[in-house]
């Protein structure tokens, strides 16, 4: 099924320019949205709790900052860009008491609306504007006169103006320069979670760790195993990112290409596909989100235990040692203390 696409010519920037926008959160996406909205002539304030370390940064970058409740009271369009697990509490405590008839509540990801963790009143427009790239890229492309493709979706539209408003917002952060794709909260949420769990984070991580274990258990040096299954992964992913799977296969050696065709289906087979389908089902029926909520309500104990177990894997020890030799690799704060 073909998607519906929109560009700058389809968007009316004056719509969002005539509104007051509160951006709650100033992380990767929050700073990109806020600065680009301002540069597009939109009235914008940032909502951060008292004592937030980001407040000084917001002020230094020339934006107004106040508490989430105060900016929600001031605005008629609220973009909630806090972490998924914090959004329901922010909505209940700070946003919902300040919503008025005709306000719009926007999100950068559909999880809380799609799974009913946030239940907004019927007289409020509920929409989503989700750039398909990290915040620093969204901002850099905007400054360069370009843009990152965006998704838009409308879940609730009491006044029939939701799509035009979302498209105007997307244009104000540069999305319509590249292309805006119309989707639904259901489609964005379920595809995003599946991609993260089965392929991008969960699937790739376990593939790398298992490959490392197989090589080390066969007697190969951990350093050699690390280079072959983790370090070189970036080279392959970059080729796929730039030109798809065909570009990657064209660029690697014939030996690598031929071996990949033969062995790839032995690693990822029909049984793997069935388990991936089971993961998708757990996402669709809410099983995953119930566990996510239980983890948060339990003080993140399950997440912390999983993090600890993962950090203790031998590939992490080997990787830290090898990255000390790589002056060109940006080092995370956890490795520079």
UniProtKB/Swiss-Prot annotation:
Residues annotated as the enzyme's active site: 109
KARI N-terminal Rossmann domain residues: 3-183
Binding site for Mg(2+) 2: 192, 228, 232
Pathway: Amino-acid biosynthesis; L-isoleucine biosynthesis; L-isoleucine from 2-oxobutanoate: step 2/4; Amino-acid biosynthesis; L-valine biosynthesis; L-valine from pyruvate: step 2/4
Pfam families referenced in this protein's UniProt entry, alphabetically: KARI_C, KARI_N
GO biological process terms held by the UniProt record: isoleucine biosynthetic process; L-valine biosynthetic process
Binding site for NADP(+): 26-29, 49, 52, 54, 84-87, 135
Domain of life from the UniProt record: Bacteria
Residues that hold substrate according to the record: 253
Cofactor stoichiometry and binding remark: Binds 2 magnesium ions per subunit.
Keyword presence, Manganese: no
Keywords annotated in UniProt: Amino-acid biosynthesis, Branched-chain amino acid biosynthesis, Magnesium, Metal-binding, NADP, Oxidoreductase
Sample GO molecular function, one term: magnesium ion binding
SUPFAM superfamilies named among the record's database cross-references: 6-phosphogluconate dehydrogenase C-terminal domain-like (SSF48179), NAD(P)-binding Rossmann-fold domains (SSF51735)
Cofactor(s) demanded: Mg(2+)
Enzyme class: oxidoreductase
Recorded GO CC terms: cytosol
PANTHER family reported for this sequence: KETOL-ACID REDUCTOISOMERASE, MITOCHONDRIAL
Similarity field: Belongs to the ketol-acid reductoisomerase family.
Biological function: Involved in the biosynthesis of branched-chain amino acids (BCAA). Catalyzes an alkyl-migration followed by a ketol-acid reduction of (S)-2-acetolactate (S2AL) to yield (R)-2,3-dihydroxy-isovalerate. In the isomerase reaction, S2AL is rearranged via a Mg-dependent methyl migration to produce 3-hydroxy-3-methyl-2-ketobutyrate (HMKB). In the reductase reaction, this 2-ketoacid undergoes a metal-dependent reduction by NADPH to yield (R)-2,3-dihydroxy-isovalerate.
Stored HAMAP family: IlvC
UniProt name for this protein: Ketol-acid reductoisomerase (NADP(+))
Species in which this protein is naturally found: Mycolicibacterium vanbaalenii (strain DSM 7251 / JCM 13017 / BCRC 16820 / KCTC 9966 / NRRL B-24157 / PYR-1)
High-level lineage: Bacteria, Bacillati, Actinomycetota, Actinomycetes, Mycobacteriales
Gene name in the database record: ilvC
């Amino acid at each position: 099924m073909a998607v519906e696409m929109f560009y700058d010519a389809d968007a009316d920037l004056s719509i969002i320019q005539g509104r007051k926008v509160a951006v709650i959160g100033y992380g990767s996406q929050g700073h990109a949205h806020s600065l680009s909205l301002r540069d597009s002539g939109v009235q914008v304030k940032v909502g951060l709790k008292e004592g937030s370390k980001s407040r000084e940064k917001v002020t230094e970058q020339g934006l107004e900052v106040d508490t989430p409740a105060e900016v929600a009271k001031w605005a008629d369009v609220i973009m909630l860009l806090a972490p998924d697990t914090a959004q329901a509490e922010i909505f209940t405590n700070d946003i919902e008491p300040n919503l008025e008839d005709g306000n719009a509540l926007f999100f950068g990801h559909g999880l809380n609306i799609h799974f009913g963790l946030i239940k907004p009143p019927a007289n409020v427009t509920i929409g989503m504007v989700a750039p398909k790239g990290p915040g620093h890229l969204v901002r850099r492309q905007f400054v360069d006169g370009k843009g990152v493709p965006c998704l838009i979706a409308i879940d609730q539209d009491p006044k029939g103006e939701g799509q035009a408003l979302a498209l105007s917002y997307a244009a104000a952060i540069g999305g319509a320069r590249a292309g805006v794709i119309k989707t639904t909260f259901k489609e964005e949420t379920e595809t995003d979670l599946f991609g993260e769990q089965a392929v991008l984070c969960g699937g790739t991580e376990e593939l790398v760790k298992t490959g490392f274990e197989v090589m080390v258990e066969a007697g190969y040096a951990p350093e050699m195993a690390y280079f072959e299954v983790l370090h070189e992964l970036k080279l392959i992913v970059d080729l796929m990112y730039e030109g798809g799977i065909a570009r990657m296969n064209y660029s690697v050696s014939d030996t690598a290409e031929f071996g990949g065709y033969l062995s790839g289906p032995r690693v990822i087979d029909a049984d793997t596909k069935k388990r991936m389908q089971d993961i998708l089902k757990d996402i669709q029926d809410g099983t995953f989100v119930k566990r996510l909520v239980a983890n948060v309500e339990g003080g993140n104990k399950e997440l912390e235990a999983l993090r600890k177990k993962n950090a203790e894997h031998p590939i992490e020890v080997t990787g830290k040692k090898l990255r000390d030799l790589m002056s060109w690799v940006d080092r995370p704060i956890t490795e520079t203390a």
